[in-house]
Amino acid sequence: AIFFLGRGRSFRTNRSDTLVRAETRQFTLTGRIDTSGVSQPIGMRVTSEGIEARFAGRAVSGLAELATRLPVQAIDPEVHRLVDGGPQERRRYLDWGVFHVEPRFVDHWRRYQRALRQHNAALRTGQAPQLVRAWDPELLEAAEIVASHRERYLARLRTAVGSVGQRLLGLEIDLGLSRGWSAERSLNEALEASFARDRERGLTHAGP
């Protein structure tokens, strides 16, 4: 229930409409968030047509706002994907944590994704090098911000995970992060070095 209030979905299924009993038209979930001694209601109504969420008596504009009100990460049966899954699984988990401690992160992340899509599209369509590289300033700036936010969050997460590992398992657990390009060069240098391969494959290889 807590996860659903914070994410607008269940960690067991992505189809919220399946949570509505066959003989009913909706289900309602409510709770209260206590912040610095101030208690405010949060609630959600799920129907076959979608989800309506409210916080402190007003409609919530989107799931991003909901998540800032009730930040939650779940360790569920699918957590093994963080280890044996691809890097996309780990980035998704990490980025969700960053979003909660750096509210502006989502804006930088979207900006980076937008620039990356344009950069890749220019590569795939075989545009002239100067047209492809025209996206580099936007891509570079957003990528550096995204990478820096991830590194700061991971430093905090590393401390917490290390403490839990020692206390519960008696093990030393450490976490590391690869930025997506060599630490011996800047991202701009990495993009230049991989440009020929990027054009050949229609994909940007260096980046967070």
Regions found by a protein language model. Name each.
Residues F4-R7, A121:
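Regular, well-ordered alpha-helical segments
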Residues T24, R124, E151:
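Residue-level marker of positions within ordered structural domains that often coincide
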Residues A1:
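Glycine-rich phosphate-binding P-loop
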Residues G6-E89, Y93-F105, A155-S163, N188, ...:
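Nucleotide-state sensing region of NTPase/ATPase domains
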Residues I75-E144, S148:
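Extended, highly charged alpha-helical segments
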Residues F4, S16, T35, R45, ...:
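Conserved NTPase motor "head" modules and their coupling/switch loops across ABC/AAA+ ATPases, GTPases
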